[in-house]
Amino acid sequence: MSSLKEVKNRISSVKSTRQITSAMKMVASAKLHKAQGRIENMLPYQRKLNEILTNFLRTDASFESPYTEKRPVKRVAVVAFSSNSSLCGAFNSNVAKMLERALEDYQSLGKENILIYPVGRKVEEAVKKMGYVPQGSYQVMADKPSYVEAYELAEKLMHEFVEKQIDHVELIYHHFKSMGSQVLLRENYLPIDLTQVAQEAAEDVPEDARSFNNDYIVEPSVGELIAELLPKVLSQKIFTVLLDSNTSEHAARMLAMQTATDNANELIQDLTKQYNKSRQQAITNELLDIIGGSLK
């Protein structure tokens, strides 16, 4: 059995750790609420943009764009979103595992034809360990989501796709559903599937807005307006994914720190019982020694 001093020191150490995890949970909670607020502020714009696009796609279902062109995949780009720091459970390791599976799917293309855009330090480190060269560093964007930086990344991807430098683009990120649920997704980004966009956009439109009269007079043409809207939708998608990933990170860290704090509380209880038991045994032994000595 451990000495009283050892158990007491361990209790003190665990209590100090509990203070750290509890403080980190509070910080993560504050950041989570801020991130949720950013998503809520962005949603009205996204919904309206999707609503307008859906209505125009119904008008011109045969619309074609450089962003919709499907061709044989000879060169692919994968954009993976993670965090810059750890202590958020399996958040980063799950992204790395899904990225590894995606790279295995495109292994036949050769490493030189697989471009990886890592958003976040953890996934950037994972990419280097896998033997790939990251296509830039986006660590600042992972910590502080910025529409300007998201727009620049989207512009780069769209330009490379239109110029046929890449034939397919995928996104790997966590979608924030609730405090306890962050779903890891692997989605196609380019070429864009207009049918799927219209379907998702229709689901995002509130029920009371679906019956609204959307018989717009369009100048110069529906096709030209859709052509203007698509880059905005694609840029908005990258920003939405960035906010999603950032919010999911804070939720995962908050949950991890809550679990760590709960585990620390349980360990303190067990160690306190052990300390009391050891102390009781020590007192009993002293009493027995005293009683035994008095009987001699």
Specify the residue positions occupied by each region the protein language model found.
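C-terminal beta-strand-loop-alpha-helix "lid" module of Rossmann-like NAD(P)-dependent dehydrogenases
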Residues: 1-296
